[in-house]
């Protein structure tokens, strides 16, 4: 009777797992041979273990899916950052090309100024030579000397002006060189950040692939547990059906035996009431 109560509790537990569905035994199910070899405690333990394992696997799969969604969002953010850095790098390249073009133009102007200065130096040397010659004939060439002095003064002013312009060009060249160095530094930093982003993106891609493989493995394991649980349900249904049938037969036999015992008792009482069972030698009832 206690075993029947325990089996009834197990049946109710299985029905609760199935959402209240009524269990039926498939006539073609071959699980009863395996189930008959299990004790009551083994059967309950096996059911509890399968149920707990199924719940644990569902929790793990849910957590892994959440991690996978988080990694996908982070990967999208890194892709957007990569696009932004690529656009910034293109702008830096254009600025660098513009600075290089300006530097080339400045170098050309500087070369022209150098040529002009060399030419002026030659003219100045020639003028000095003429001035030396004029000093020999200073008395006769005062008017010519005044003109030459004026010309020398003009040349000196021109040289001073050219030297100032040359100094300005050199200062401009230094500024452009500093700007070019700064652009190169920024370009190096951008390249390093781009390499780091690509490396991190590759690591995240590998991690996502590993998590996907883990999810597939856990899903396969969950399917195996589901199959084992279905098998156990079939075995339990078969066993409960057999136990119920045997209990019904046993109840019928007990009821028949009780009826026969009652009939025998009634017959015995009726026999004693209708027959004299007094023992002759002792005078007492037989």
UniProtKB/Swiss-Prot annotation:
<keyword id="KW-0325">Glycoprotein</keyword>
<keyword id="KW-0732">Signal</keyword>
<feature type="region of interest" description="Helical">
    <location>
        <begin position="61"/>
        <end position="235"/>
    </location>
</feature>
<keyword id="KW-0175">Coiled coil</keyword>
<protein>
    <recommendedName>
        <fullName>Puff II/9-1 protein</fullName>
    </recommendedName>
</protein>
<feature type="glycosylation site" description="N-linked (GlcNAc...) asparagine">
    <location>
        <position position="156"/>
    </location>
</feature>
<feature type="signal peptide">
    <location>
        <begin position="1"/>
        <end position="19"/>
    </location>
</feature>
């Amino acid at each position: 009777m206690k075993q029947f109560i325990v089996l009834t509790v197990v049946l109710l537990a299985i029905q609760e797992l199935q959402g209240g569905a009524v269990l039926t035994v498939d006539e073609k199910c071959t699980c009863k041979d395996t189930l008959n070899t299990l004790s009551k405690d083994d059967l309950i333990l096996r059911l509890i273990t399968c149920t707990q394992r199924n719940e644990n696997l569902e929790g793990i799969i849910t957590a892994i899916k959440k991690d996978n969604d988080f990694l996908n969002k982070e990967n999208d953010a890194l892709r957007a950052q990569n696009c932004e850095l690529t656009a910034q790098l293109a702008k830096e390249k254009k600025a660098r090309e513009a600075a290089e073009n300006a530097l080339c133009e400045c170098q050309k102007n500087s070369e022209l100024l150098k040529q002009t200065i060399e030419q002026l130096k030659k003219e100045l040397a020639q003028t000095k030579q003429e001035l030396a010659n004029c000093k020999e004939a200073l008395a006769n060439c005062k008017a010519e000397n005044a003109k030459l002095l004026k010309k020398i003064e003009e040349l000196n002013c021109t040289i001073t002006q050219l030297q100032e312009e040359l100094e300005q060009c050199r200062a401009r060249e230094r500024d452009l060189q500093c700007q070019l160095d700064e652009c190169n530094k920024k370009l190096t930093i951008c390249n390093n950040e781009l390499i780091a982003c690509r490396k991190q993106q590759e690591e995240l891609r590998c991690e996502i692939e590993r998590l996907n493989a883990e999810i597939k493995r856990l899903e396969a394991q969950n399917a195996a547990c589901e199959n084992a649980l279905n098998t156990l349900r079939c075995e339990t249904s078969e066993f409960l059906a057999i136990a119920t049938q045997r209990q019904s037969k046993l109840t019928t036999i007990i009821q028949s035996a009780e009826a026969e015992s009652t009939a025998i008792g009634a017959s015995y009482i009726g026999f004693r009431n209708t027959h004299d069972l007094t023992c002759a030698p002792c005078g007492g009832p037989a």
